[in-house]
Amino acid sequence: MDLLVIGGSGLLGREIAAQARRAGAAVAATFHQRAAEVDGVDWRPLDIRSRPEVAELVRRIKPSTIVNAAFRQSDWTTTADGAMHVAAAAAEAGARLVHISSDAVFAGRAASYDEECPPDPVTPYGAAKAAAETAVKGLDRGAVIARTSLIIGGGASVHERHVHALASGAAAGVLFTDDVRCPVHVADLAAALLELAGSAYTGIHHVAGRDAVSRHELGRLIARRDGLSEAALPAGLRAGSGPPGALEVRLDCTVTQSRLTTRLRGAHEFLTPVSAR
């Protein structure tokens, strides 16, 4: 087997599997509750929280490369322990590992964060992601750890669905003007991860879009692309009223982008309406 995608039924996992299949790779992917519809993929159920189950699957499939896209924001065992289980199995099997991490490992106190910046999480999810990175580095020194940001694409992301719900009145709430990230298109991210998987690079890489935008600005871009009313998207401040966490986290992807042929577009580019291109 060329590639095993852990967490293959999610937005990113599906895109990785689909791109790898189009490139001619033999692909297996795991799901926890329901398999996705990606032609030619060998779907396997997996509870990543079980170390023996992960080890047995990797021994059975014998993948050359493993991409771990599995996480659950509210579950330390899935996000942190699961990553440890995958890294241990990859190291034992001699498989190339690409572990997907998050900008949630940062507190947002710095103007920007490059690959040399140490994690300083301020949320349980960020702490779980930071712990996962530590486990991967300790168990598999040849692994790639790819930190990314908000993932957008094809109308299927949480952020896109939320914008549509707000615009239609199906959901209440606001989009924060002081919560800034570097959104990335799922197709760009998947291509970059597969490129890193096929390279000799190891260690931390930042893989996000080039534009730093607020949640509200991102919502307006999505609305503009999809022909929704931008005026229907309420704006608000996260500071002092929203959920705890970092406000502004800008990933500096300069080093990683210099190593890739895949171009990491910014939100202003990949969310441009088709009619305006």
Question: Where does each model-flagged region fall?
Answer:
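N-terminal Rossmann NAD(P)H-binding glycine-rich loop of SDR-like oxidoreductase domains
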Residues: 1-23
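N-terminal Rossmann-fold cofactor-binding loop
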Residues: 29-37, 48
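NAD(P)H-binding glycine-rich loop region in Rossmannoid oxidoreductase-like domains
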Residues: 42-85, 89-91
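Catalytic helix-loop patch of NAD(P)-dependent Rossmann-fold dehydrogenases
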Residues: 105-146, 150-152
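NAD(P)-dependent short-chain dehydrogenase/reductase
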Residues: 134-181
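Alpha-helical substrate-binding/gating segment
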Residues: 163-172, 180-207
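Mid/C-terminal beta-alpha module of Rossmann-like enzyme folds, strongest
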Residues: 190-192, 198-243
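Conserved C-terminal active-site "lid" loop/helix of NAD(P)H-dependent oxidoreductases
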Residues: 214-220, 235-277
